[in-house]
Amino acid sequence: MTPIDAKRPLQLNDQGQLRHFLSLDGLPRELLTEILDTADSFLEVGARAVKKVPLLRGKTVCNVFFENSTRTRTTFELAAQRLSADVISLNVSTSSTSKGETLFDTLRNLEAMAADMFVVRHSDSGAAHFIAEHVCPEVAVINGGDGRHAHPTQGMLDMLTIRRHKGSFENLSVAIVGDILHSRVARSDMLALKALGCPDIRVIGPKTLIPIGIEQYGVKVYTDLAEGLKDVDVVIMLRLQRERMAGGLLPSEGEFYRLFGLTTARLAGAKPDAIVMHPGPINRGVEIESAVADGKHSVILNQVTYGIAVRMAVLSMAMSGQNAQRQLDQENAQ
């Protein structure tokens, strides 16, 4: 499995600050830590009576979702609103794209409305990078998920969840379980865990749902759930993505649950204080039983809460990086 993007200077300005957020591939550990630290500082905003800070006042954030989403779209909207930005959410099913307008033309029109930032989710891998290459230089682009490729804000909210519950990545064993082949979350989590110094990253699933060459990410591959879960600190369950599957990859959902579904009995093989995560939406009785999803080890709802803070961090840092680059360009032009 070859990652679509190597290190992307496009994501950073000339001073090494974030200006787009397209993938975690190639981003330095220091920058990922800065995102986590910034997100940590934003968590208290959600506990205020007035849940707003003025960092993006006067800015317009456009959510352009070409795939259905509940958590990602809603948390991006809340994140932008809590930063005091104006928010536009494009309903693709009623937009001109459903009448034949191209993605490029749609974004050009939004650009003409003086939007400052696009949050884009698209079914095509590489869509967010394409947009970042073609929008005007003043617009920041945030990847809300593109095909099988990347979901960088989900990756970072997962890292914040782990850090807040476990403190450090340096001695952790983390298992990512399920449909690895179709999961952009798995790719982003693997990249983030490796960059942040996690020494033991495991992927667990049927052979048909594990990409060829995944070992290049520095992970250990298991096709037996009990063996893979032994003594892990963190279990990240993945949604079974039937909508992306070709025929023959999986006999049935029941068979998948029998072999790879996370039950209380199977979780007992992990460490006693292990945490259980899931990016959602959860398919109960397919990837995970309700007793685990709702049990004492589950931090799934924490992930949703932390997602708002992480997206606030990314939006504010990308806008700050764009502003710094604009000022630098103006100084160089004089």
Swiss-Prot record:
GO terms for cellular component: cytosol. InterPro entries: Asp/Orn_carbamoyltranf_P-bd, Asp/Orn_carbamoylTrfase, Asp/Orn_carbamoylTrfase_sf, Asp_carbamoyltransf, Asp_carbamoyltransf_Asp/Orn-bd. It catalyses: carbamoyl phosphate + L-aspartate = N-carbamoyl-L-aspartate + phosphate + H(+). It is an enzyme of class 2 (transferase). Gene3D superfamilies: Aspartate/ornithine carbamoyltransferase (3.40.50.1370). GO terms for biological process: 'de novo' pyrimidine nucleobase biosynthetic process; 'de novo' UMP biosynthetic process; amino acid metabolic process. Keywords: Pyrimidine biosynthesis, Transferase. It holds the Pfam family OTCace. Carbamoyl phosphate binds at residues 71-72, 121, 151, 154, 280-281. Pathway: Pyrimidine metabolism; UMP biosynthesis via de novo pathway; (S)-dihydroorotate from bicarbonate: step 2/3. It comes from the Bacteria. Its EC number is 2.1.3.2. Heterododecamer (2C3:3R2) of six catalytic PyrB chains organized as two trimers (C3), and six regulatory PyrI chains organized as three dimers (R2). NCBIfam families: asp_carb_tr, PRK00856.1. HAMAP family: Asp_carb_tr (MF_00001). This is Aspartate carbamoyltransferase catalytic subunit. The gene is pyrB.
